From Swiss-Prot:
Pfam families: Trypsin (PF00089). It comes from Phoneutria nigriventer. PROSITE patterns: TRYPSIN_DOM, TRYPSIN_HIS. InterPro entries: Peptidase_S1_PA, Peptidase_S1_PA_chymotrypsin, Peptidase_S1A, Trypsin_dom, TRYPSIN_HIS. Residues 1-245 form the Peptidase S1 domain. It is found in: Secreted. This is U21-ctenitoxin-Pn1a. Its EC number is 3.4.21.-.
């Protein structure tokens, strides 16, 4: 997260860290959001093909890697990794995946402050501002963060986002902005490498966090004037429901 601030324990109980085996060491790879006691939503590009389940694990209830043995922290193995069937490797569209934990996540009145995130109730496109969180790089090519960070970004209407990326002078003309994407930022604040798959969310009138997007592949981090790319969760609800039933 670029230009973010450090979060406090328990503020985002549905946030997870996905670790991937790199040369026999498990390392921070992506973020994700807990949907229910079995399923987590994240990005498709987080996973190398062919998928080897034992090369990934998920941490819940964690805020800082300096305290990864804290009593709130739980680690889960995975039983399924389901990539969206229309996702193409290194592509930008349909960059969404669902992962299932091998054992259920205790979210019902969990003393560990672990919970699922809600979906927004309305069908209208989100507008205004939204927040993204993660343990990713704090600047392009920079170090990753030991602490979970948060940043609030302006949402950019997709037509405008499409114009920015598709402009003849754009350095990222190859990125096709489609209606199933959300764009946010462009003001120097952004998600970055290793934040992928993490949640973009807003708060409803009751103050409940609602998931509107997941961090997707995009331009370089915090690239001046270019908004960050997210998958629009509402566009994938029927796919998600089908996978989870």
């Amino acid at each position: 997260i670029v230009y973010g601030t450090v979060t406090t324990p328990g503020k985002y109980p549905w946030m997870v860290s996905i670790h991937e085996r790199v040369k026999d060491v498990m390392k921070q790879a992506c973020g994700g959001a807990i949907l229910n006691e079995n399923w987590i939503v994240t990005a498709a590009h987080c996973f190398d093909q062919p998928i080897i389940l034992k090369d990934y694990e998920v941490y819940v209830g964690i805020v800082s890697w300096l305290h990864k043995n804290a009593p709130t922290v739980q680690k889960f193995q995975l039983s399924k990794i389901i990539i969206h069937d229309k996702y193409v490797k290194d592509g930008f569209a349909n960059d969404i995946a669902l992962i299932k934990t091998a054992t259920p996540i205790d979210i019902k009145g969990s003393k560990y402050g672990v919970n699922g995130i809600c979906f927004p109730s309305g069908a209208t496109d989100p507008s205004g501002e939204a927040t993204v969180i993660g343990w990713g790089m704090i600047r392009g090519g920079g170090p990753i963060s030991a602490e979970l960070r948060q940043v609030t970004l302006p949402l950019v209407p997709w037509q405008k986002c499409k114009q920015i990326y598709g402009h003849p002078d754009s350095e990222f003309e190859y990125i096709q902005v489609v209606p199933s994407m959300l764009c946010a930022g462009g003001n120097g604040k952004d998600a970055c490498q290793f934040d992928s798959g993490g949640p973009l969310f807003q708060y409803d009138k009751k103050g409940v966090a609602t998931l509107i997007g997941t961090v997707a592949n995009g331009a370089d981090c915090a690239y001046a004037h270019y908004p960050g790319m997210y998958m629009k969760v509402s566009a994938f609800r029927s796919w998600m429901d089908k996978v989870m039933t």
